[in-house]
């Protein structure tokens, strides 16, 4: 999905593959913490991942499970800044010794354009099933930490999902959530997963 999306935003095939980590680190990339480490990813591996992804989705549906697909919250290649110098892109600090990643500001017009392209490319490959994961500023700080800004972030991401898929459900992890983002989204459109709540409660009271 990322490979096809980046080709739509002036990346060459080599640049798009160079953004992707090696298979052993892809989980961290989907958590927005790293890019490129262990890459570039061969096109043959990308193609095999598509085949595997389709098999996983088919099995989930066969078992009556609800797939949760990747959404878009602004994580982008660092190299996007050079290609779109007018866009509001912030560079994050190093994470566990890895070079920091880049964040496209949700208030920038390019955010909606790129997010919609990402969801479209995902739909072409796998279809869409109405539930999308997105964790804005996961394990990092927003460029502007005010209630007004974070409210706008929540509204923008919600609008993106609803534009692509009316009635979409946004799924967010509890450990990196921010209250103003949460409150900006209608309750029926947001599901918060508290993945480690039993051992490490993240919030004692409802918001």
Question: What do the predicted segments below correspond to?
Answer:
Residues 200-202, 207:
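Positively charged, low-complexity/disordered segments
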Residues 1-195, 199:
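Aromatic-lined carbohydrate-binding surfaces of glycoside hydrolases
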């Amino acid at each position: 999905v990322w490979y096809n999306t980046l080709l739509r935003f002036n990346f060459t095939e080599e640049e798009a593959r160079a953004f992707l980590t090696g298979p052993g680190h892809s989980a961290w990339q989907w958590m927005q913490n790293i890019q490129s480490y262990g890459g570039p990813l061969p096109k043959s591996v990308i193609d095999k991942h598509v085949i595997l992804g389709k098999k996983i989705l088919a099995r989930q549906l066969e078992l009556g499970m609800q797939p949760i697909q990747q959404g878009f919250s602004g994580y982008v290649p660092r190299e996007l800044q050079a290609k779109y110098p007018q866009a509001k892109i912030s560079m994050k600090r190093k994470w566990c010794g890895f070079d920091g990643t880049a964040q496209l500001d949700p208030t920038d017009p390019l955010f909606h354009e790129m997010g919609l392209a990402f969801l479209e490319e995902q739909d072409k490959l796998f279809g869409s099933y109405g539930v999308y994961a997105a964790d804005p500023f996961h394990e990092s700080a927003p460029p502007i930490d005010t209630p007004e800004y974070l409210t706008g972030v929540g509204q923008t991401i919600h609008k993106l999902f609803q534009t692509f898929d009316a009635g979409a459900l946004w799924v967010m992890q509890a450990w990196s959530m921010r209250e103003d983002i949460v409150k900006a989204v209608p309750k029926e459109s947001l599901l918060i997963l508290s993945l480690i709540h039993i051992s490490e409660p993240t919030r004692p009271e409802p918001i």
